[in-house]
Structures are given as structure tokens and as C-alpha cells.
Amino acid sequence: MNSLPPSTSAVSSPVSSVDSPLSAVSSSIGSPGVPGTPSIGYGPISNSQINSSMSVSRLHAVSSSDDVKPPFGLKSVSGSGPMLSQKRMCAICGDRSSGKHYGVYSCEGCKGFFKRTVRKDLSYTCRDNKECLVDKRQRNRCQYCRYQKCLAMGMKREAVQEERQKNKERDGDYECSSSANEEMPVEKILEAETAVEHRTDLHSDATGSPNDPVTNICQAADKQLFTLVEWAKRVPHFSDVPLDDQVILLRAGWNELLIAAFSHRSISVKDEILLATGLHVPKESTHNLGVEAFFDRESSHSAEVGALFDRVLTELVCKMRDMQMDKTELGCLRAIVLFNPDAKGLTSSSEVELLREKVYASLESYCKQKYPDQQGRFAKLLLRLPALRSIGLKCLEHLFFFKLIGNTPIDTFLMEMLESPH
């Protein structure tokens, strides 16, 4: 694959030399590249995707119904150590604790992992010698050792069972909705949307030329890519996915995620797209882009870009406006796009699929509670996903989001952002 030419400012020359936008997302960390026409669906996938080539003789089975002793080399945490400092850390992986869960200060990821393990009575295997490191970065690498560490640190199986019994005693409908929201809280999804929105507002400006939509879009894309990573890190359980898979998921869905965001932002204006920079791109300007000057290709691109802009307005912006889609629903749709179990190269496809199913359940529960008179609202929301997918592929072919941050490949940039704190 040809490398991009030396970078110039997106402001002065947003498209000075253009390869396929997919070249910007080619792997620089050894991850599989993104195919030209990736297959990303929104339905369930088959468990046959999860294959194992491990030797049976190297696997050590353990059932969650057994209280397993700490493995060799696993050190306990002193009660006077940093785990009980003012900023409590997860006793399992060292991430930030969200409180005491099942008897131990732990993060949401380890809490959810332990609860799922106990409730479903899952059995795990270790590929190595039962001494795998369990920390923030590698907690998903070995479920066997992670579960052992949960027990070693003092998590109580009976606490999970008591919690489940209490839930069963509640009203059936409430229990169902409460359980779904507990697994994937829509409040946290909304917080992710609003946190990024506020950050965008702080850094937005209107100094660009409203007569140069290509430059404006490139400027906005640069800002949105920064905020996209921050948004993803705030989505519940995304940080629980292995880091390499986080990069794969963002690389597979970044175009659809950004399109969904600016489409929803544009429902307050008519026949325009409202960019993250605060600038408006009117419909008329996209039909007179003269993009052949930018792309050095056939002039037919100009008409195609104008038609693509019309699709964004009619299939996304107008539909969102007509149904008055709120930010919680937008956040859930974007989370569904993010948790894509069909993304090529994933090592945790089944876990990602489970997270997507939890978003589905939480969104459906939210629609029933918030809009009880609109029985078809949940289905109507999901119908926006195929249109978003189709438009996203077209955008990759034509106009959006190339040369976003100079010569830095997107994979490397995403890796740096994901490793940085909030």
C-alpha cells in the first residue's frame, strides 16, 4: 500500500494528494488491515466465529462453581496498601474502582465479569501455567486467572446470588428493564455523548471559510477524531475489551460514528450540515464543490458528492428530526456501531457481540419507559443503521476524513489516545 505524501495542513490543503481513505486506516501495529468492503452487520453472529487452536493438553479447566485457591505466585493486597488509599483502585486489575462490589473494591469491568461468571456458572481454561498477569491492560487475556484473582481478592459468589434473588422478588417488567440497564446503563451512554459534546463546544470556532466546504469538513473531522476516541473510552465496558481490539473496533466504525454524530447535530438546522467547528455547510455548496479540482479525477465526483450529501439529509438528518431522536438514543445507536463483532481481526468477538446485545436490550427498555405510546420506536431507531452503513461506505469512497492528522496513521494515533487517561 502506498504511503501518504508529506502532510500539509488540512486548513491550507485538505486534499492535496489523495489515496483511498482506507489507506489512512491501514494497520501500523500489526493488526489486520480493513478490507475494501468490510462486512459489518447489526444482527447476531454465529458462535462458529470463535475458533480455538489450543492444544487440549495445555488447558486447565475450572468451573465458576468451585472456590479456587489463589494460583501460585498470586500475591494478595495488603489492607494498608494503595488499594485503600483515597483514590481506591480495583483489587483485581488496578483500574479505577467504582465502589465495593461483592465484598471487594473493583472496577465495573471486573464486577460485571464476576457477576456473569457466577450467574451463568461459566467454566474457563488457562492457556499457560495458571499464573497469567491480570492488570488493566491484560485483564481480558485469561478469564481463568481473572476469575481466580476475583476469588483470591475476596469476591463472594453468594453476594451475586443474593443480588439476583432480590431482583427476582421485584415486579417482572421492572426487573427486566432494571437488569438490562444495569448491564449497559443508558445514563452512562448519555454521559459519554454530553461529555464529548461539551469538549467540542469548548474548542469550536468559526474562523474557517464557509465557502470552502471541503476545508471545513477536513477541519471538523480532525476535531471529531480526537473526541471520538474520548467518547469510546467513556462508553460502558469498551475499556474492558482488549486494547488491540479497541483499535480494531474504532478503525472499523469511525466513519459511521462521526456521520451519526454530525447528522444528529444537524437536526436543528434546515438543509445544512452543522460541523463540530460550529460552521454550517449548506446543501447548495455541496452541489457546486468543483471537487474535480481537489481529487484530480472525473468531474462526475461532484454530482456524486452532492447526491451523497442529499442522502445524509434525507435518510439520516430528516428521519432523526421527524422522530425527535434524543441524545440517549443516538448514543445507543453509536454504541451498537462501535461494538461490531464482525470487525476483522477481533480476538474477543464473542465478548463484543455480548456487549452489542446489551446495548440492544438497554435501548429497547429505554424506549418502552421513555416513549410508552410509541411501540414501534425501537424498530424505527434500528432502521437508521443500514442507511448509516451505506452512507458511511460511500463517504469512504469520496470525501470524508482523509489526512486527518498529517502523516500519523490512524491506528497509531488511536493507540496513543486509548492508552492516555481521560
From Swiss-Prot:
Residues 181-421 form the NR LBD domain. A zinc finger (NR C4-type) spans 90-110, 126-150. This is Retinoic acid receptor RXR-beta-B. The keyword Ribonucleoprotein does not apply. Residues 161-173 have a biased composition (Basic and acidic residues). It is found in: Nucleus. Keywords: DNA-binding, Metal-binding, Nucleus, Receptor, Repressor, Transcription, Transcription regulation, Zinc, Zinc-finger. Homodimer. Heterodimer; with a rar molecule. Binds DNA preferentially as a rar/rxr heterodimer. Heterodimerizes with rarga. Coiled coil: none annotated. Residues 90-155 bind DNA. Residues 1-89 are annotated as: Modulating. PANTHER family: NUCLEAR HORMONE RECEPTOR (PTHR24083). GO terms for cellular component: RNA polymerase II transcription regulator complex.
